[in-house]
Amino acid sequence: MLKLVDLEKKINSELTTKIRNSEIKHNQIYVEIEKDNLMDVVLFLKTNKNTRFSQLIDITVVDYPEESQRFKVVYLFLSHEFNQRLILNYSINENEVINSLTSVFPSANWMEREVFDMYGVIFKNHPDLRRILTDYNFEGHPLRKDFPLTGHTEVRYNEEEKKVVSEPVKLEQNYRNFDY
């Protein structure tokens, strides 16, 4: 079993041209790559006898609206065999399409759907990329920092029409303090 420092060196030596940066923090390896290298890096991490990161724990996104590359896509991997964790990330522009990991990790399916639903990141070659947490007619992506806290519409049951209706949000402004 490789120590964490040796494992980081091994990954860097094998993937020299594909890794932008790596470091060890909080007893985990953090690796930054370019988005075009995702599949090569993930396949290496999963199949190499010295790494064996066989479980994809999570996929998430961090929104930096002020940056030129607005989103940082973050993948968390676990090697059961070596009891190690690795966090892989890369940055993308708002409208970039990225590769789906569902062909390598079938568990990525719902994780990628959640990222699509909450942030609007589109995954190429995903077998079923549709909303998973919000309604199909929901407007916007609620975890983006530019999404209004109250949302765009209010959904409620209308007793007179005997059905669920969607209306623009109406908020009283009388008691709000706009002096930031």
What are the residue ranges of the model-derived segments?
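Terminal low-complexity/charged segments
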Residues: 1-180
